[in-house]
Amino acid sequence: MSRVGKMPIALPSGAEATITAEQITVKGPLGSLSQALNGLVQIENASGTLNFKPANDSREANAMSGTLRALVNNMVNGVTKGFEKKLMLVGVGFRAAAQGDKLNLSLGFSHPVVHAMPAGIKVETPTQTEILIKGIDRQSVGQVAAEVRAYRPPEPYKGKGVRYSDEVVVIKETKKK
């Protein structure tokens, strides 16, 4: 059995899980998330803990139990605490400004870059060079952060560009004559 799939998920106070044949829905103080189920994994809700078991002894069912457990754990954490990614702009004249559900970026191009946020994602700019992306869906938060970073990834010689706050950019040495 999968090592990850063996571990039960304890539902914190304020979070509740509803399991049907097709999907699992987790509701919490920040919102609700749903995940489609397949027949390879059985989920039991026993007094505030969720247990995951493969439906049969196949390798696929074993792997899916660990995968589904990780996805549901992220859903529980999302609806109770939420997720956030912090991006930094490094470079002269690089600026960011949040306006409602849009993020205006000035990244050294001849035109401003406007990134529209999907539903359920909030963006803040504490300073002009910091971007904070928040939401309850871990996958969506990471996807939006990756899309914003892709506009101007850090270049290896000076390190200019959009980077994650915990990202380490290895600076290359310039060519010598």
Curated annotation (Swiss-Prot):
Source organism (scientific name): Herminiimonas arsenicoxydans
Gene Ontology CC, one term: cytosolic large ribosomal subunit
Domain of life, source organism: Bacteria
UniProt-recorded name of the protein: Large ribosomal subunit protein uL6
Quaternary structure note: Part of the 50S ribosomal subunit.
Gene designation per UniProt: rplF
Job description of the protein: This protein binds to the 23S rRNA, and is important in its secondary structure. It is located near the subunit interface in the base of the L7/L12 stalk, and near the tRNA binding site of the peptidyltransferase center.
Family: Belongs to the universal ribosomal protein uL6 family.
NCBIfam families registered for this protein in UniProt: L6_bact
GO BP terms in the entry: cytoplasmic translation
Keywords annotated in UniProt: Ribonucleoprotein, Ribosomal protein, RNA-binding, rRNA-binding
HAMAP family: Ribosomal_uL6_B
Disulfide cross-links: none
Signal peptide range: none
GO molecular function ontology, one term from the record: structural constituent of ribosome
